[in-house]
């Protein structure tokens, strides 16, 4: 990988991390009120959609491969978070909220997959 692409990857990662933290902070009152991790759920579903779109556009040559690396791996890799999903799932289970944990896991995987497919389909039509 070219040196300049590494820089774009790092900058993209910084942007994605800042965006994720902004969403988490903005939705913290709602998460506290609901007792359900809607912030990370929304982040991961949106990220899945955008990655599906990015991969489709890069795969068709609409966007150069460098955009896939900088935006897909950098921005979206830092924006989305499997580790936080896992620890939030563990927290729900730890407090005995088995039903909410199952709902969170099901929604995360199901909506994430649907969003990725929707993004890919949109990307094949643009």
UniProtKB/Swiss-Prot annotation:
Q: Which InterPro entries match?
A: FluC
Q: Name one GO molecular function term.
A: fluoride channel activity
Which portions of this protein are annotated as coiled-coil regions? none
Q: Transmembrane segments in this chain: where?
A: 5-25, 38-58, 69-89, 97-117
Instruction: Report the activity regulation comment.
Output: Na(+) is not transported, but it plays an essential structural role and its presence is essential for fluoride channel function.
GO cellular component terms, semicolon-separated: plasma membrane
Xref: Pfam families: CRCB
Q: How does it sit in the membrane?
A: Multi-pass membrane protein
Location in the cell reads: Cell membrane
- Annotated positions binding Na(+): 77, 80
Which UniProt keywords are present, listed alphabetically?
Cell membrane, Ion channel, Ion transport, Membrane, Metal-binding, Sodium, Transmembrane, Transmembrane helix, Transport
Q: Which GO terms describe its biological process?
A: cellular detoxification of fluoride
Q: What does this protein do?
A: Fluoride-specific ion channel. Important for reducing fluoride concentration in the cell, thus reducing its toxicity.
Membership in a protein family: Belongs to the fluoride channel Fluc/FEX (TC 1.A.43) family.
Question: Which HAMAP family does this one have?
Answer: FluC (MF_00454)
Q: What is this protein called?
A: Fluoride-specific ion channel FluC 1
Question: Native species of this protein?
Answer: Deinococcus geothermalis (strain DSM 11300 / CIP 105573 / AG-3a)
């Amino acid at each position: 990988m070219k040196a300049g692409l590494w820089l774009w990857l790092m900058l993209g990662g910084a942007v994605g991390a800042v965006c994720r933290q902004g969403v988490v902070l903005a939705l913290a009152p709602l998460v506290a009120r609901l007792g359900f991790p809607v912030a990370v759920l929304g982040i991961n579903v949106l990220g899945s959609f955008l990655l599906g779109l990015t991969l489709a556009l890069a795969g068709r040559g609409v966007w150069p491969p460098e955009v896939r690396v900088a935006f897909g791996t950098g921005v979206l890799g830092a924006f989305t978070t499997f580790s936080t999903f896992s620890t939030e799932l563990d927290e729900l289970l730890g407090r005995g909220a088995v039903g909410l944990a199952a709902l969170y896991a099901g929604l995360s995987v199901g909506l994430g997959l649907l969003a990725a497919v929707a993004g890919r389909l949109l990307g094949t039509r643009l």
